[in-house]
């Protein structure tokens, strides 16, 4: 019989051979392991909620009729004819209830002697370690840290996911010698026999035997490790030799845990084995045991010794555990790696105090792994809190701190701890400003703006803030007058300059716009204050009560009886309700319907925070549209979340309370005006992509629209709201193996806000945001008419384009508001207290209440965005590129460089071409650029214009590689005068080495392009040459070296004449237009060409055109 249980050696002086087995069974002291007789279908461990079912249905669901579920004891001993004995599970302590996840093994374990330190490939830690900080960082990972996330039963129901690799060394080492470190004997005991039912379809016996062999080693090592740790703790010894001995044993145990996990999850094995391996992992809680017994147990011991020990042991152990677990992630399915990502963040955070940042930056490691886990784990307050302690971006850290106290599983720090972390976040931003000022003035200024914002935001969380009127006034004035202004006095929120802002400012406020919105919302909802009206609406007390009950259940798990909680009466008095919030004695499963509770909750709201939040929102509504939308969309979803929660309220009085609250608080006049401006702006920029987006979603109702985006989210600012308690009203998130995200690129967004990616650069995501904002407003107006927001189809929408049909749906879509009536739903003056507390934020203009009035064209009354300086249609043009054709970031949204040069662009009515002087003016260049780009999008058959660029010799010398790439990708068509080619050949004999090299490479490039038929050689006469190496004409024209420019210009003129003559012939009447353009940066040559009526452009224009065509075709042209 093959028995999983390991034989014990009663003699501690003898070596223990883990590779041998006999009929003796070792007594199991692990709370996670079975310890008495049990049947296969017995009830699982009673202390965890996921073990309430008698058996797992995973195997039956995944492969019906093939593999029955396994019970505890399955791998304790299996043969073809015998069933091994197995113990019944016993009650576990707090340490045993941990999450169940799986991972990979280290290929080698450092050899450790009791008389010396282990020879690991890591440097020693510095001796000046702050031991107090070490103890504090180790303390945060306690034995009950991960119990809340453990749910192996749930994971068993998930689909099978293939791992990314194969563990190549799944065989355990046959012998492990530990006699040199043994201190306490392992007591042997024989469990009673047990009869149980085997699966109907037997898994591979080799597979089971392999797991049994590994498990035998694990059982003995677990027992011995716990006994040695207990002995070391109770003996109060400070001998480092004992610590290193336990270290050696612990690293071997970690190796075997991971070996077991990898073997069980090996995806190349038969499906029956794979399913069985997953079941075994869950039932035997191997992953929990790896974390609890393999890592946390020893760290607890080290924590107790942190004040008088060399930190080398702790350093080595954390690094070993980190490397082992991180390697394991490569070889296991994603669903088994999610929580291990969070644990890698924990290990990194514990190591921060052990090494200085210049040596190993564990802070960056912790932030990375916490960020990785946040892609799949939502609503975990402890995770948000932990990343807030290590995050580099101070604003994002502040937001995550706010989310940690306002989510499904809220973190509940003391007020002192919360204030301390807020102070640390502010100090971190201050340090960043000091370091940035020495390197970059722009970065230093941005950091200063961020510090000012955080300073005035965080001060509102001080307990004394509400009592200090002067401080409230200072904070209010900052958000009203100073927020958004730089050191030069430029205001990014100045509406008149919305199309000529500094692109750097646009990108900065774009990236941080969602974080500004989230931080203000977290202030608005009380930053974790459960008595705040928003906290009551989103039921924060309910989740605080669940958190408390879970903690108490752990403490009182010795008793089988569960405590009964009386349901709370939603009509109870206000005083009793708030007293219960303090005590958390009753449940809060329902939203209160007693109006007095809501009126009294106004006493627990920070009115200054409301005013500051609305000031910031109003500023963003007046900002450049690309900056306004990420901020505005966050607020729109917050409004939708409130309205969806109100659908659950059965009291008309409470609904009326919130409707009046929203009508008085939100800047509805600016919101409606911005919605109408977006409609006009979309009409002026209507193009196929925008049309497709509108037609795809226009007919959807609000619920359908939200449901679609919940499963196909493509905006990072909305994804960042996932997990907050208020967003749970829209999409409730927990742990998701495959999040409902359409654009996974924003998972890789920078630490400094959301990413401004390629789709933002070309305006694609701008139109996605615009469409969503307009349709969300439309959906709110239709689904919640009591809010006062209306959609009118009676008013005409301003449109400057004649090519849009008059019956197009956008031309009749306008947003309007009902006049606000305080007496509505207030028959008995019940809401007078609300009116006294909340003032009306913004008066509604008459144009926004008249359903037939043409809406405003700007959020500033009486103005029009089409008349603002720098207004252009949103499309990449010539001015969005630099001299090398590189795309200038954010220039599509701003004409800042042109306005700075005294140029005002208005493309609404310019002429295309100035025939008199043949000058490609700025206006003509833009339209010519767009027309050529548009013509080049199709295939050769659809071209209505074929353009050949003829490049002079100087441009060839400077840009031959760039030209080669454009021609090689068929992005543009090129021709070359034989004169230019001969000049380049001649320059190979120059005395300047740089010229010689450039000329040589140019000649090679031209020959290669000619061989690939990517360039057309052109004679003096304008005819096409038979070969690029022709030289007959040069022999006849001996003066060509002194008249190169004239020969080139004359050849282009004759070529264009030839093209024109060919179009006039009968057989070529349907042929597309062809002409040649000279490309030169030489002003003299440029003027000579214009005198001959030849179109010219510079290399910047050429490369800009190539870049735009490359964007359209998905090609790299530089």
UniProtKB/Swiss-Prot annotation:
One of its GO terms (cellular component) is telomerase holoenzyme complex. Transmembrane segments: none annotated. Keywords: Phosphoprotein. The keyword Phosphoprotein applies. The modification Phosphoserine is found at residues 170, 190. SMART domains: PINc. The keyword Phosphoprotein applies. InterPro entries: Est1/Ebs1-like, PIN_dom, TPR-like_helical_dom_sf. It holds the Pfam family PIN_4. GO terms for biological process: nuclear-transcribed mRNA catabolic process, nonsense-mediated decay. GO terms for molecular function: telomerase RNA binding; telomeric DNA binding. Residues 1-62, 77-119 are annotated as: Disordered. Present with 504 molecules/cell in log phase SD medium. This is EST/SMG-like protein 1. It comes from Saccharomyces cerevisiae (strain ATCC 204508 / S288c).
């Amino acid at each position: 019989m093959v028995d999983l249980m390991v034989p014990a050696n009663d003699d501690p002086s003898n070596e223990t051979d883990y590779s041998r087995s006999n009929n003796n069974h070792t007594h199991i002291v692990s709370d996670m392991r079975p310890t008495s007789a049990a049947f296969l279908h017995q009830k699982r461990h009673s202390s965890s909620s996921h073990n309430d079912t008698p058996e797992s249905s995973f195997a039956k669901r995944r492969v019906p009729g093939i593999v029955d579920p396994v019970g505890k004891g399955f791998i304790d001993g299996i043969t073809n004819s015998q069933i091994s004995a197995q113990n019944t599970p016993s009650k576990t302590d707090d340490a045993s209830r941990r999450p169940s996840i799986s991972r990979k093994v280290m290929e080698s374990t450092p050899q450790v002697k009791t008389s010396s330190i282990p020879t690991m490939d890591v440097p020693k830690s510095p001796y000046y370690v702050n031991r107090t900080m070490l103890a504090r960082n180790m303390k945060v990972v306690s034995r009950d840290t991960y119990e809340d996330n453990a749910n192996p039963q749930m994971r068993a129901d998930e689909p099978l996911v293939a791992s990314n690799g194969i563990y190549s060394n799944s065989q355990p080492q046959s012998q492990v010698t530990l006699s040199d470190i043994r201190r306490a004997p392992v007591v042997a005991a024989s469990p009673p026999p047990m009869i149980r039912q085997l699966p109907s379809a037997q898994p591979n016996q080799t597979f089971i035997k392999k797991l049994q062999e590994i498990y035998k080693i694990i059982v003995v090592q677990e027992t011995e490790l716990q006994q040695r740790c207990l002995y070391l703790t109770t003996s109060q010894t400070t001998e480092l030799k004992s610590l290193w001995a336990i270290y050696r044993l612990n690293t071997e145990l970690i190796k075997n845990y991971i070996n077991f996990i990898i073997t069980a999850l090996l995806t190349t094995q038969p499906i029956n084995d794979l399913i069985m391996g997953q079941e075994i992992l869950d039932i035997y809680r191997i992953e929990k045991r790896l974390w609890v017994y393999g890592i946390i147990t020893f760290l607890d011991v080290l924590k107790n010794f942190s004040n008088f020990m060399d930190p080398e042991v702790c350093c080595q152990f954390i690094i070993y555990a980190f490397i082992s677990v991180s390697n394991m992630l490569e070889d296991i399915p994603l669903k088994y790696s999610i929580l291990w990502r969070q644990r890698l963040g924990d290990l990194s955070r514990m190591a921060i105090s052990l090494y200085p940042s210049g040596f190993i930056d564990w802070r960056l490691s912790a932030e990375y792994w916490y960020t990785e886990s946040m892609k799949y784990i939502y609503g975990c307050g402890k995770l948000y809190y932990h990343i807030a302690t290590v995050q580099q971006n101070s604003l994002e850290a502040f937001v995550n701190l706010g989310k940690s106290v306002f989510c499904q599983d809220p973190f509940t720090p003391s007020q002192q701890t919360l204030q301390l972390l807020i102070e640390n976040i502010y100090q971190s931003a201050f340090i960043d400003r000091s370091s940035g000022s020495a390197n970059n003035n722009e970065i230093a200024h941005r950091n200063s703006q961020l510090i000012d914002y955080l300073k005035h935001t965080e001060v509102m969380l001080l307990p004394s803030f509400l009592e200090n009127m002067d401080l409230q006034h200072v904070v209010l004035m900052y958000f009203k007058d100073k927020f958004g202004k730089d050191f030069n006095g430029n205001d990014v929120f100045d509406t008149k300059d919305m199309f000529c802002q500094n692109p750097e400012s646009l990108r900065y406020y774009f990236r941080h716009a969602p974080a500004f919105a989230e931080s203000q919302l977290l202030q608005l909802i009380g930053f974790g204050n459960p008595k705040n009206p928003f906290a009551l609406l989103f039921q924060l007390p309910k989740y605080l009560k669940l958190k408390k009950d879970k903690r108490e259940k752990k403490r009182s798990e010795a008793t089988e009886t569960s405590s009964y909680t009386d349901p709370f009466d939603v009509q109870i008095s206000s005083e009793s309700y708030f007293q219960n919030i303090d005590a958390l004695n009753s449940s809060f499963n329902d939203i209160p319907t007693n109006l007095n509770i809501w009126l009294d909750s106004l006493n627990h709201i920070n009115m200054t925070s409301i005013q500051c939040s609305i000031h910031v929102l109003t500023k963003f509504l007046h900002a450049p549209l690309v900056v306004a939308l990420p901020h505005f969309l966050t607020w729109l979803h917050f409004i939708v979340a409130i309205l969806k929660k109100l659908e659950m309220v059965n009291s008309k009085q409470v609904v009326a309370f919130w409707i009046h609250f929203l009508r008085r608080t939100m800047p509805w006049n600016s919101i409606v005006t911005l919605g109408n401006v977006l409609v006009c702006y979309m009409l002026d920029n209507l193009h196929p992509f925008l049309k497709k987006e509108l037609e795809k979603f226009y007919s959807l109702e609000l619920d359908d629209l939200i449901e679609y985006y919940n499963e196909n989210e493509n905006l990072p600012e909305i994804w960042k709201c996932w997990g907050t308690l208020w967003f749970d009203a829209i999409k409730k998130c927990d742990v998701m193996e495959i999040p409902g995200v359409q654009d996974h690129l924003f998972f890789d967004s920078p630490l400094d806000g959301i990413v401004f990616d390629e789709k933002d650069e070309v305006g694609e995501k701008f139109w996605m945001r615009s469409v969503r904002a307009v349709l969300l407003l439309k959906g709110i107006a239709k689904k919640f008419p009591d809010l006062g927001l209306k959609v009118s189809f009676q008013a005409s929408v301003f449109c400057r384009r004649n090519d849009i049909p008059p019956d197009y749906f956008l031309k009749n879509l306008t947003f309007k508001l009902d006049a606000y009536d305080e007496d509505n739903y207030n028959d008995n003056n019940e809401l007078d207290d609300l009116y006294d507390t909340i003032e009306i934020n913004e008066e509604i203009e008459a144009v926004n209440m008249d359903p037939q009035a043409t809406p405003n064209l700007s959020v500033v009354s009486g103005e029009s965005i089409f008349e603002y300086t720098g207004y252009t249609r949103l499309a990449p043009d010539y001015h969005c590129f630099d001299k090398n054709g590189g795309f200038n970031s954010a220039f599509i949204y701003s004409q800042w460089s042109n306005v700075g040069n005294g140029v005002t662009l208005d493309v609404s009515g310019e002429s295309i071409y100035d025939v008199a002087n043949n000058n490609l003016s700025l206006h003509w260049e833009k339209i010519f650029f767009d027309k050529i780009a548009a013509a080049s999008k199709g295939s050769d058959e659809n071209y209505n214009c074929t353009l050949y660029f003829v490049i002079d010799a100087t441009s060839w010398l400077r840009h031959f590689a760039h030209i080669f790439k454009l021609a090689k990708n068929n992005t543009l068509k090129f021709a070359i005068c034989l004169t230019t080619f001969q000049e380049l050949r001649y320059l190979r004999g120059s005395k300047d080495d740089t010229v010689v090299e450039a000329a040589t490479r140019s000649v090679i490039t031209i020959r290669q392009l000619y061989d690939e038929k990517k360039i057309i050689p052109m004679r003096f006469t304008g005819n096409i040459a038979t070969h690029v190496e022709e030289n007959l004409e040069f022999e006849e024209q001996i003066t060509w070296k002194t008249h190169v420019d004239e020969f080139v210009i004359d050849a282009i003129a004759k070529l264009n004449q030839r093209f024109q003559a060919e179009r006039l012939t009968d057989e070529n009447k349907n042929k597309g237009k062809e002409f040649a353009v000279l490309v030169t940066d030489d002003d003299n040559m440029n003027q000579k060409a214009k005198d001959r009526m030849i179109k010219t452009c510079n290399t910047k224009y050429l490369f800009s055109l190539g870049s735009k065509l490359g964007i359209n075709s998905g090609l790299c042209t530089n």
